[in-house]
A protein has these predicted regions:
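Extreme N-terminus nucleophile/cap motif
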Residues: 1-56, 76, 182, 187-188, ...
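Conserved beta-strand-loop-short alpha-helix elements that form
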Residues: 2, 102-112
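Fold-independent oxyanion-binding glycine-rich loops
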Residues: 10, 79-82, 107, 185, ...
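Short acidic (Asp/Glu) patches
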Residues: 55-66, 79-100, 120-123, 217
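Catalytic core of PPM/PP2C metal-dependent serine/threonine phosphatase domains
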Residues: 75, 150-186
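Long, charge-dense
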Residues: 117-142
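A conserved acidic, glycine/proline-rich C-terminal tail/linker
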Residues: 192-230
Length: 246
């Protein structure tokens, strides 16, 4: 199980700058979600994705603060990992996962991880390097998006996973140079035993500086919940938010 945070902005900024004083509250979640952290920046200009991943807790990392402060971009994703049992703690299993101008982060589990492998296009299957369910989720999404387009492709990927796999949560964020897609798709009853009822909730906050989406568990005054079984699509040119039933 993991924590997700992402933003898009009309201006180049950083996570500490756009989130503000409460960013430290989000980072503190790495006391539990301590198996790694990862950052990707996805500029709308189409410049290459910058990817940083470490197998350590963000709050205890000697490089985390400097990395999130210096990576300035108009779009970025941040992931705090709490590894699913049976999935190794390694840099290759640390999110985000990237392909072309797409970057992806996931919170939840798909059992067994390989159950969706037959539905992944061979060109993407050849890119899989570890045993992570999340990596397979990403490449299934890429397979379907290439065939059907962004929203229809994502819906198709979710349908395949739900038909063939056993899942706790498929919450995720996918970003490219044109769009920022956040998915809230989870089984509340399958949260960790210790976690509050809102553990899987995703919330968002439009501001003059951009749009933020994040997992729960930290101070989020004024944020709006993204309803379960829905996705939010942000157009990175207009910053309009479209909420879609999935």
């Amino acid at each position: 199980m993991c924590r997700l945070l992402g933003y898009v902005s009309p201006n180049k900024t950083s996570f500490p700058a756009i989130v503000g004083d409460y960013f430290s509250d989000f980072v503190a979640l790495s006391s539990v979600h301590c198996d790694g952290w990862g950052l990707s920046t996805v500029d709308q200009s189409g410049s290459h994705i910058v990817l940083n991943r470490k197998v350590e807790a963000a709050a205890a990392s000697s490089t985390f603060d400097a990395t999130v402060a210096k990576n300035i971009a108009d779009g970025a994703l941040l992931h705090l990992r709490w590894a699913t049992k049976g999935i190794s703690i390694s840099e290759n299993n640390t999110h985000p996962f990237v392909y072309g101008d797409y970057s992806f982060i996931h919170n939840g589990s798909i059992f067994p991880p390989d159950v969706i492998a037959p539905f992944i296009d061979p060109k993407f299957k050849s890119l899989i390097v570890e045993e992570s369910d999340s990596e397979r989720y990403f490449y299934l999404v890429m397979t379907e998006v290439e065939k059907l387009g962004l929203v229809a492709g994502f819906k198709s990927a979710l349908a395949i996973i739900k038909e063939h796999g056993d899942t706790t949560s498929l919450n995720c964020m996918l970003m490219n140079r044109d769009y920022f897609l956040t998915v809230s798709e989870h089984d509340t009853a399958r949260k960790p035993d210790w976690a509050p009822d809102d553990y899987y909730e995703i919330k968002y906050l439009p501001t003059p500086e951009g749009v933020l989406f994040a997992s729960s568990g930290w101070n989020q005054p004024g944020w709006t919940m993204l309803e379960n079984h829905h996705a939010a699509l942000v157009n990175r040119s207009s910053f309009e938010i479209e909420v879609i039933a999935i």
